[in-house]
Amino acid sequence: MPQLTTSRVPVGFVEATVPANGITLNYVRGGTGPTLVLLHGYPQTWYMWRKVLPAMAEHFTVIAPDLRGAGGSDAPTGGYTKSSLAEDIYDLLAGLGLADQVSVVGHDIGTMVAYAYAAAHRDSTSRLVLIEAPLADETLYQLPSLTPQGPGLWNFGFFTLQNGLPERMLAGREDTWVDGFVDWLEVVKGGVDEQAIAEYAAQLRQPGHTRASFDYFRAMHADVAETIHHRDTPLTIPVLAIGAEGTLGQMVHDQVVNYANNVTGDIAPTGHWVAEEDPVYLTARLLDFLADDHASPGAQNAMATA
């Protein structure tokens, strides 16, 4: 079994915890400049951003938290609606004095949290990036579990089972589970390396974390109602919607335009795990999008010449 190394945190970053919304959240922080928050997905942690963190920290104060129920954060038995997870992040930023004018980037489950954050904190959210996940609306009920090309998004239904079967299936098999789940959606093989597999499996072995990882999905019925509520008041901030050519593709953009008026779409040359499969692509795309009017003049000039 791959072992975790002691050099998980990139140079220039620190890992810490902070009270937020009644729990304790773990996060890494680095860089200076406007606030940029990176929100991970399932079954990952902040570690999924490790390959893009150094470049982003040259221009931003970067905060990459572990969501409630993941990594080094607490895993209580409730609070997994995406609006609740978004308030966790807002409280974390407020506690650090970083909640004013924030750019938010989400991947997978983090996409749903990022949208909920922007919808709830419109005056203090500058830009939004949504990567490789549908928003939690009626679209979820139309996703096929089986397609002519093979398995569809079967996991959305399986993970919502309330009888403990998903937890029992994973118990003692976390490394095998993460490795197989990642491989299913990975196009650039090895992008999610052995160290990352070990990281994500280890966090699932922490008390309550496997249950919490499925609670993200079990909360989606409530999320659907909350998301639909926001549809009549679309976001006006710039939004970048990224799908991957090996997985969701154009679907991400085509759904997000129903919730925001200023949407740019892009297709990553990867599978689902964009930040790990092609960090060069994602870093360049993020810097280009976030540079337009969000960063300080000095940072904008630096990015323009990078």
Predicted features and spans:
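Catalytic histidine-centered segment of alpha/beta-hydrolase-like enzymes
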Residues: 271-283
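Flexible "cap/lid" subdomain of the alpha/beta-hydrolase fold that forms the substrate-access gate
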Residues: 2-17, 22-25, 32-35, 55, ...
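Serine-hydrolase catalytic-loop signature spanning alpha/beta hydrolases and amidase-signature enzymes
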Residues: 43-51, 62
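A short, charged, Gly/Pro-tolerant segment at domain boundaries
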Residues: 301-306
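A short, glycine- and basic residue-enriched loop/turn
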Residues: 45-46, 112, 271
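Structural cue for short, hydrophobic secondary-structure segments
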Residues: 38-41, 64
